[in-house]
Amino acid sequence: MRKGRHMPRHTNANYARPGVSPNHPMFGRYLSTVGFPPAQNVYNHWRHWYQPGHLWWTQPPQLQHPSSSFSTVRHPFNRPPRPPDPYQWSSWRQTGVLPHTRGLHLSAGLMESTDRPPPQKRRKSAEGEISQRSPQHSPPKGSRSPKGSPEWLRNVSSIEVANRTSAVPELKRHWEDLSHLCKAAPSVNRGKQKWPFDFSVMSYNILSQDLLCDNTYLYRHCNPPVLDWRNRFPNIIKELEQYSADIMCLQEVQEDHYKQQIKPSLESLGYHCEFKRRTGLKPDGCAVIFKRERFSLVSCHPVEYFRRGVPLMDRDNVGLIVLLRPIDPHVSLSNICVANTHLLYNPRRGDIKLAQLAMLLAEISRVSQLPDSSVCPVLLCGDFNSVPWSPLYRFIKDRRLDYDGMPIGKVSGQEETPRGQRILTVPIWPRSLGISQQCQYENQTRDSELRDLEQTERESFTEASIEHCLRLTSAYSHHLKESGQPEITTCHSRTAITVDYIFYSAALGDVMAQAEYSAPPERGLQLLGRLALVGEKELQKVNGLPNQHNSSDHLPLLTRFRLHPQADS
């Protein structure tokens, strides 16, 4: 999830498992549907909780550097104290504490036009100049919030004192074993047993320190030491080492920390690291990291969504795709295509999100294509800034999206009521982008087939629908098994929802597979297990995220898959 000046006034998770009754709702009021399946009662189960000044974790910490002493001034709107001169904050940034010279614009809730996107964090202006405003310590005065909060969020004083004076317990997560639902017997061919290849995958938004410093109002519930990079980094590395995933897809990886600390630490643990920084001088990016003893790198393909001269593609988000070869001397295994991305946050720019996703899917289709025109197994991980069962989510899983008359603000499902009346244009992205409405490069089709498809392509650009050819399934069900409550992957002072996913090419017979979208065993993956997510009650007990044990405002997703050997030729 993007942390920025324009945070959701009505950020929500308007999704839930069908048939679940809302017990102890997390969010302050019911949310409208996005106008697509599942039915209204499904979406009504999800709520959003945010009410500044009433959340138990929104009391601002005293940002005092341990080695600094200076007078502070009280800012208007009851903002927390900060140094009077922002240009003296450079020493704070070097040590990883909060104040930051890079600034933020006011919330897009104060913008003149609801059709205009909110400005990006530290985004260059049209003249190429970077804003020098001070960090945003509190949400804008005019920002809106839901009408109410759960009872446990209203009792600020007692909970706050308890959490600030006593140790916070560790968040308990258990492993969900699904292996008994998979066909575990090894295949037998020509008298030889061919054992499958099992491996683990993690997706984790580790929270860039620069973005944290730019958006301190999101972390008022935290004690300042919790937010110090000198404390966060050891926790994050310890977490990565503890889970020891064979493949890790990380988002919000800050480039200087990556080069100086993260990459050396992980390389010492036997990992190979690939990194792609966001464009436009942004400080963070995406990384794909894998164990050298389990995989070898076939190719690496960074994806930049920024396209000069294409107004829709003027944002600096990126993706990173690697093609990996499993290392097993005894059997022949298919390559695995691993994609990692962090899509645009802005809830009102679903058109940009879909265009970014289309570019990523086009590159995945190219990289994963096999000589027989089929595709190797695909893993698609990342922070998609979209909730389950939103139109963007359904597009990934169902391979098609009919968007005729769809409001742009409903694409990601992040907001209850989209502001503005803009709907998705037909087509969403221009032909000059070079991506067809089937999310493939237009020059990817062979010349012999191109003439037969020219008319179809022309017609597709006038239809209000998009498609892709990948068969993808979510590794998580998005509701808790015991209570049916919504799973949470990200949580801070203003929201708690699911935006992080691991999608995969499900093999026939996989526990999460949709039968019509399943792949042959050697061209797909079977889900063996996953690290369970948590809900509202569990986060309440640990004072939300980040905390002294969990150093990001996201939780890591961790799964284990099985790849079956290829048949002998």
From Swiss-Prot:
Gene Ontology terms: biological process? 3'-UTR-mediated mRNA stabilization
Instruction: Give disulfide pairs as residue numbers.
Output: none
Residue ranges, annotated region (Disordered): 1-22, 63-92, 109-155
Here the segments flagged for biased composition (Polar residues) are: 63-72
List where Low complexity composition bias occurs.
139-150
**Top-level taxon of the source organism:** Eukaryota
Q: Name one GO molecular function term.
A: catalytic activity
- Its family? Belongs to the CCR4/nocturin family.
| PANTHER family with a match to the protein in the record | CARBON CATABOLITE REPRESSOR PROTEIN 4, PROTEIN ANGEL HOMOLOG 2
The protein depicted here goes by the name: Protein angel homolog 2
